[in-house]
Regions:
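NAD(P)H-binding glycine-rich loop region in Rossmannoid oxidoreductase-like domains
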Residues: 5-60
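General beta-strand structural signal in soluble alpha/beta enzymes
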Residues: 50, 75-77, 105, 181
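Rossmann-fold NAD(P)-binding glycine/threonine-rich loop
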Residues: 52-75
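Short gly/pro/ser/thr-enriched loop/turn and capping motifs at secondary-structure boundaries
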Residues: 54-59, 81-85, 110-113
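Short alpha-helices
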Residues: 75-94, 244
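Catalytic-loop motifs flanking and including active-site residues across diverse enzymes
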Residues: 85-89, 165, 236-241
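Active-site-lining helix/loop region of Rossmann-like oxidoreductase modules
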Residues: 95-225
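Low-complexity, glycine/alanine/valine/leucine- and proline-rich hydrophobic stretches
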Residues: 226-242
Length: 244
């Protein structure tokens, strides 16, 4: 139904508009932004699944919820690895507690070229975290934390980044008092984040991983659980989107 190609000098979009009204479910797997595409598909009568991981784009997509409801359509936002799998892992871990109040996400690796560009951009923006009832902004690339991922990935330094997870996790579980998200990055990644990418991204990233740390109460005791998945992030995102 639709195809999109983007490079440093070329931006090409091709859409077979006649097929828009024939689609029952559309999965948006191209790079951000998705909000205008989602609007077109919803108005054409299709259910929409977005794999966007851009913070501003996902906020704009959430604003389309009322429109989707008016058209009796479903608009699923954040159906990828992060966000996406992170929410599923949070929901799974929540069943292991009597109550939860903290969730901390960390991601290593990228999927395809658009994912790599988003990783680069996320380190240049301002991270957003939920802290005791308030949204806090911190510079991306700050707040180094050594995060252990499932083997064969292992441990990587992770940093605050402008990603969509905190807003979506807070919307899904408003009882959470603290939410943060970090991505792995090298020193070069952080120092060059505000510059154009020095080299074109690979067609597909290598082995990646997603983990989430959840804290809460179990009986009268404070408890913490960590769960993660190691796999190519493109594979994770595809599985989440396909099974949504």
């Amino acid at each position: 139904l639709a195809a999109k190609h983007r490079s440093a000098a070329i931006n090409i979009s091709v859409v077979r508009k006649r097929n828009l009204v024939q689609a029952h479910v559309v999965v948006l797997a191209c790079g951000a932004p998705h909000n205008e595409l989602a609007l077109s598909f919803v108005q054409a009568g299709a259910h929409v699944v977005s794999m966007s991981d851009d913070a501003d784009d996902t906020t704009a997509l959430l604003d389309l919820n009322d429109l989707a409801t008016q058209h009796n359509r479903l608009l699923v936002v954040g159906a990828a690895a992060s966000p996406g799998l992170t929410g599923l892992l949070l929901a799974h871990l929540a069943t292991q507690f009597d109550s939860i109040d903290e969730a901390h996400v960390a991601v290593h690796g990228t999927g395809g070229p658009d994912c790599a560009r988003q990783h680069h951009s996320a380190l240049a923006g301002s991270s957003v975290g939920w802290h005791d009832g308030s949204w806090l902004r911190r510079p991306s690339g700050s707040g180094r934390e050594l995060c252990w991922f499932p083997e064969p990935v292992g441990a990587y330094d992770c940093y605050r980044a402008e990603v969509a997870d905190p807003a979506l996790l807070h919307r899904a579980m408003p009882q959470l008092q603290r939410i943060s998200a970090r991505i792995s990055a090298t020193r070069r990644d952080r120092f060059t984040a505000r510059l154009p990418m020095l080299a074109p991204p690979n067609a597909e990233g290598g082995m990646g991983a997603v983990r989430i740390e959840v804290r809460g109460m179990r009986g009268v005791s404070r408890a913490m659980e960590i769960v993660g998945v190691a796999e190519r992030l493109a594979h994770i995102a595809a599985i989440v989107a396909a099974t949504t």
